[in-house]
């Protein structure tokens, strides 16, 4: 996918290994139970996107924009959000907060990210290290 717009699109149980999303505007897109570990996102804008029960270990979202995005039960261990803009973004675990979830979310790198106060408070509340963050 290169320099396109994806609107109201759904990826269900998809294995998107080596798929490349370059300069894409994703609006109201749903990724459900998908393997995104080797998916590449570059220069994308995420608006109203939902990542539900996706395997996203080690993925890099560096320098991208997220507005009204939900990460519902998504495994983001060792992923990178360096220099991103986060507005009204939620990171929701399964119905129970487990030690595995706390350990996993603490491995996410938010260095240099800009985020609204609500997103900041939610991440800080689960113990994420938020140094070098800019509040919007």
Label each PLM-derived region with a short phrase:
Residues 1-136:
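Tandem repeat scaffolds
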């Amino acid at each position: 996918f290169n320099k396109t717009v994806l609107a109201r699109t759904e990826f269900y149980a998809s294995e998107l290994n080596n798929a490349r999303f370059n300069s894409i505007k994703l609006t109201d897109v749903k990724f459900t139970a998908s393997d995104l570990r080797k998916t590449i996102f570059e220069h994308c804008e995420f608006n109203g996107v939902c990542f539900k029960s996706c395997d996203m270990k080690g993925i890099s979202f560096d320098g991208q924009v997220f507005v009204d995005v939900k990460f519902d039960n998504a495994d983001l261990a060792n992923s990178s959000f360096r220099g991103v803009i986060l507005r009204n973004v939620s990171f929701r675990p399964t119905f129970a907060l487990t030690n595995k979830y706390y350990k996993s979310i603490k491995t996410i790198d938010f260095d240099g990210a800009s985020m609204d106060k609500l997103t900041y408070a939610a991440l800080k509340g689960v113990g994420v290290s938020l140094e070098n963050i800019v509040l919007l």
